[in-house]
């Protein structure tokens, strides 16, 4: 029994000795610093700064994956639609800027020019503001500008000195019709001189085979002119309209036609005017009767059968001095014609009632109403005649 106790004691003693040794060994291992592995060498992936250049500052927040603010989305700006374009064309009647050489009486056209001191602006002073504020003014040139002396064999032969062209220029007139029964009053020489004079003055002309083009506000206007004594010219009219139709936004056709002193159009006028519209014309201007006639609105387009006289040097005191300016306003939207509207401006060929002073003047009040009523009366007899709402 004693041997087991001793043996146990010896075993316990041995165990204690072993544990004490282990404890010391473990403490040694903890206190001893562990050698660090050498850090791996990383390759430089950023270019070295150029000599003399400061390296860029690094953003301390680089790589921060915090919330990103979204940039506000700008609403698309709606473009304003282009404004409509309104083209105003003024049409007026017979302008005899000169006289017959046999008219040597007091108050002939040349005599009046002398009395006003050669002032070119005098003759159209009463309507200049109207012509200044339109896009195009077109009148019938019922004369020649020439110094020729050889005349046609006829009763009245009109001419004016070539310098008289300044009257048209100072009147703010851009274009004239030359197809009429007086353009050859001084034969071929007179005709050639007239065209040369107009060219030198920068005035456009249409008729007798010539076509005129004029542009305003990006809109092109074409003008044609004819002596319309019969309907034999229909093929030529149609061909010419088709030719210029592809080049112009507005086509104007002038006819010198009808019977003098008659206030109603004849059958030729009615047929030719409506034919021109059917062929593609946008407005028809008529002259020759020397008095006013009615107006058709045919298929939405105007036929002015006679504008009457205007600045008329062919008579020092005609009994009927009534006339008018017809303005046709064309409205375009995105290059397309969307409306055609007519305006009648009643006038007198003279600023005086007792004599022709060759100064067309706008009428007012009762006189303007009287002329307007005449036009409406003559129009009422037409199949497509206008009313008060032209």
Where are these regions (language model features)?
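Sec-dependent N-terminal signal peptides of Gram-positive bacterial secreted proteins and lipoproteins
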Residues: 2-26
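Acidic, metal/ion-coordinating pockets
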Residues: 22-37, 41-43, 47, 51, ...
């Amino acid at each position: 029994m004693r041997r087991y106790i001793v043996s146990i004691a010896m075993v316990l003693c041995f165990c204690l000795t072993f544990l004490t040794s282990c404890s010391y060994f473990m403490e040694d291992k903890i206190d001893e610093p562990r050698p660090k592995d050498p850090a791996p060498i990383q390759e430089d992936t950023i270019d070295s700064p150029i000599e003399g250049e400061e390296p860029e500052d690094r953003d301390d927040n680089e790589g921060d994956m915090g919330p990103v603010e979204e940039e506000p989305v700008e609403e698309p700006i709606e473009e304003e639609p282009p404004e409509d374009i309104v083209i105003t064309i003024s049409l007026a009647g017979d302008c005899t800027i000169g006289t017959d050489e046999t008219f040597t009486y007091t108050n002939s056209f040349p005599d009046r020019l002398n009395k006003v001191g050669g002032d070119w602006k005098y003759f159209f002073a009463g309507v200049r503001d109207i012509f200044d504020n339109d896009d195009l003014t077109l009148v019938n040139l019922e004369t020649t500008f020439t110094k020729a002396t050889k005349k046609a064999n006829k009763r009245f032969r009109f001419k004016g000195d070539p310098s008289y062209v300044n009257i048209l220029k100072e009147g703010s007139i851009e274009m004239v019709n030359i197809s009429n029964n007086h353009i050859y009053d001084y034969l071929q020489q007179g005709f050639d001189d007239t065209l040369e004079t107009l060219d030198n003055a920068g005035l456009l002309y249409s008729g007798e085979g010539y076509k005129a083009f004029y542009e305003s506000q990006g809109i092109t206007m074409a003008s044609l002119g004819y002596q319309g004594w019969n309907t034999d010219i229909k093929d030529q009219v149609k061909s010419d309209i088709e030719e210029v139709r592809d080049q112009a936004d507005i086509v104007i056709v002038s006819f010198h036609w009808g019977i003098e002193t008659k206030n109603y159009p004849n059958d030729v006028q009615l047929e030719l005017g409506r034919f021109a519209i059917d062929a593609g014309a946008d407005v028809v201007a008529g002259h020759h009767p020397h008095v006013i006639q009615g107006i058709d609105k045919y298929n939405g387009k105007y036929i002015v059968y006679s504008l009457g006289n205007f600045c008329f040097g062919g008579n020092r005191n005609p009994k009927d001095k009534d006339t008018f300016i017809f303005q046709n306003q064309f409205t375009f939207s995105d290059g397309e014609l969307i409306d055609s509207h007519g305006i009648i401006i009643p006038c007198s060929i003279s600023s005086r009632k007792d004599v022709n002073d060759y100064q067309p003047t706008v009428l007012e009040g009762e006189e303007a109403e009287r002329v307007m009523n005449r036009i409406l009366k003559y129009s009422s007899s037409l199949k497509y005649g206008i009313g008060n709402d032209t």
